[in-house]
Curated annotation (Swiss-Prot):
Low complexity compositional bias, start-end: 316-329
Gene Ontology cellular component annotations, sorted alphabetically: membrane
Region of interest: Disordered: 301-329
InterPro entries noted in UniProt: TMEM255
Keywords for the protein's UniProt record, in alphabetical order: Membrane, Transmembrane, Transmembrane helix
Keyword Isomerase tagged: no
Similarity remark: Belongs to the TMEM255 family.
Identification of the protein by name: Transmembrane protein 255A
Compartments where found: Membrane
Main location: membrane
Transmembrane segments: 30-50, 57-77, 89-109, 226-246
PANTHER family cross-referenced by the UniProt entry: TRANSMEMBRANE PROTEIN 255A (PTHR33721:SF1), TRANSMEMBRANE PROTEIN 255B-LIKE (PTHR33721)
Lipid bilayer topology: Multi-pass membrane protein
Length: 349
């Protein structure tokens, strides 16, 4: 009895613990997936802003934001399901795994490009000039009017007044004449007279920008995308691990409560006394006197006669009023005392 009570108490204590562990895992899964979804939205926003900032620089890493965002969305849905929870979480883990790989690659590409191919020194020194978009006729007028001035002044006027062809001074040569499109930020210090092998500062022109300040914004956006991709990389790994540990857990409190309630009526210390009293009621010959009530009747009801007479002539005795049962006498064969398959004891004189 003591052992059964101990087992019952331990099971009752383990049920809230298991349900608490399930709720804790579910809460942690929702927290990490929501956090990953927020980081994915930031990666997508910053990556698209960096990609669309210029026309010729499209290295913003927004692809991991799409993949990680979809995987985290599936994780949020799967964490709130019960029947199809495992399938949804497995799909979420697969997408998050691909998003982690994409975040790693994009972090390297964006970081290397921002560090190696964008030089902000000419921009901070105001040596880069913005060429607005004008018509071809205006550009020809600017070029023709600039021939009357000195070469250095002509270069500056061509750069500031959006000429299609400008002259950039060079150490080994007198001038270089590159062709510049409209809405372009051009840096002569980074343009080595068209020799792409000898370019020392990376990109020398940034097409389709509103001003040269957009290049500084692009630089900051690329580094922001790099940092966010690194954060998404580690957060995706943590999210996949948390979802992997939660996908096989199920709430077991209702089923265990039913089993505990069903086992209470079958406990030994409740059922044993009932069975014992039932058995003692129907099987109690040892607790009764050796003779039944039939043997304790008066001699007027049962006259004394030798047992041999009863055994010799059992059929010769005719019924008479003196041998009839009285109204207060119990029945001759009482089922509670003698079952049908047992023979009653012999009658005593």
């Amino acid at each position: 009895m003591h052992q059964s009570l101990t087992q019952q108490r331990s099971s009752d204590m383990s049920l809230p613990d298991s349900m608490g562990a399930f709720n804790r895992r579910k809460r942690n899964s929702i927290y990490v997936t929501v956090t990953l979804l927020i980081v994915s939205v930031l990666i997508l926003t910053v990556g698209l802003a960096a990609t669309t900032r210029t026309q010729n620089v499209t290295v913003g890493g927004y692809y991991p934001g799409v993949i990680l965002g979809f995987g985290s969305f599936l994780g949020i849905i799967g964490s709130n399901l019960i029947e199809n929870k495992r399938q949804m979480l497995v799909a979420s883990i697969v997408f998050i795994s691909f998003g982690v790989i994409a975040a790693f690659c994009c972090a390297i590409v964006d970081g290397v490009f921002a560090a190696r191919h964008i030089d902000l020194k000419p921009l901070y020194a105001n040596r880069c000039h913005y060429v607005p978009k004008t018509s071809q006729k205006e550009a020809e007028e600017v070029i023709s009017s600039s021939t009357k001035n000195s070469p250095s002044t002509r270069v500056m006027r061509n750069l500031t007044q959006a000429a299609r062809e400008v002259n950039c001074p060079h150490l080994s040569r007198e001038f270089c004449t590159p062709r510049i499109r409209g809405n372009t930020c051009f840096c002569c210090d980074l343009y080595n007279c068209g020799n792409r092998v000898e370019i020392t500062g990376g990109y020398y022109e940034y097409i389709d920008v509103s001003s040269c300040q957009d290049i500084i914004h692009l630089y900051h956006l690329l580094w922001s995308a790099t940092i966010l991709n690194i954060v998404g990389l580690f957060l995706g790994i943590i999210t996949a691990a948390v979802l992997g540990g939660f996908k096989d857990m199920n709430p077991t409190l209702p089923a265990m409560n039913c089993s505990v309630e069903n086992t209470h009526p079958t406990v030994s210390y409740y059922a044993h006394p009932q069975v014992t009293s039932y058995n003692t009621y129907y099987h109690s010959p040892p607790h009764l006197p050796p003779y039944s009530a039939y043997d304790f009747q008066h001699s007027s009801v049962f006259p004394s006669s030798p047992p041999s007479g009863l055994s010799d002539e059992p059929q010769s005795a005719s019924p008479s009023p003196s041998y009839m049962w009285s109204s207060s006498a119990p029945p001759r064969y009482s089922p509670p005392y003698y079952p049908p398959f047992e023979k009653p004891p012999p009658y005593s004189p």
